Regions:
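Aromatic-rich, lipid-facing transmembrane alpha helices and their immediate juxtamembrane interface loops
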Residues: 1-192
């Protein structure tokens, strides 16, 4: 309700980046085991995720033509720094979501990437409405979803190939809550 009431006050949404950071900190608090392999992998995803976002923002090549609003905080190369953490969190959550699936790593990578594309599809209208980003054409192009699929596929192939394993009792609940949050807002925005 608070979000719907404050849609005319975009400065309220500058906290969006803080929620991403808080999600990351909570995940790391309950994450186990901590290992060098885990931290190198997570850092690599963050750095490469940010780099892809920066290239995308500045060229339109990866996801299409878009610009970030102010709600995600401090930017470098017109890209919010929190996008590095966002990629880490999303890949982490989906990786843990499918940890019990005993299937070929390529198929698992494909399914994981599809899940992230569906997540993005549900999140996009809400993110646009909350000034997280704006698309040049008004709505995200197909190019955006293809970009999400390809980038996440590469991340998942890597982490499933190196057999990164961990346990986190919060991750599935956090993913479900985020998905339901964006899904509910998406539905509400269509109704009002």
């Amino acid at each position: 309700v608070g979000i719907l009431i404050s849609l005319d006050k975009p400065h309220y949404f500058t906290v969006a980046g803080y929620f991403v950071v808080l999600s990351f900190l909570l995940l790391m608090l309950f994450h186990k085991p901590h290992s060098v392999k885990f931290w190198i992998t997570l850092t690599l995803i963050g750095v490469l995720g940010f780099a892809v976002e920066a290239v995308g923002t500045n060229t339109g090549f990866v996801f299409g033509n878009y610009t970030y609003g102010k709600s995600l905080g401090v930017k470098l190369f017109q890209t919010p720094l929190v996008m590095a953490i966002n990629w880490m969190v999303l890949v982490y959550l989906v990786h843990d979501l499918l940890k019990g699936w005993n299937i070929n790593f390529m198929l698992k990578s494909f399914v994981s990437s599809i899940i992230l594309v569906v997540y993005d599809f549900v999140m996009e209208p809400v993110a646009i409405k909350l000034d997280m980003w704006t698309w040049e054409a008004g709505n995200p192009p197909l190019h955006n979803y293809i970009g999400w699929f390809v980038v996440s596929l590469l991340f998942f192939i890597y982490i499933y190939r190196i057999k990164l394993k961990f346990d986190n009792p919060l991750s599935r609940t956090l993913f479900l809550l985020q998905f339901l949050f964006f899904g509910a807002l998406n539905l509400l925005f269509r109704l009002i």
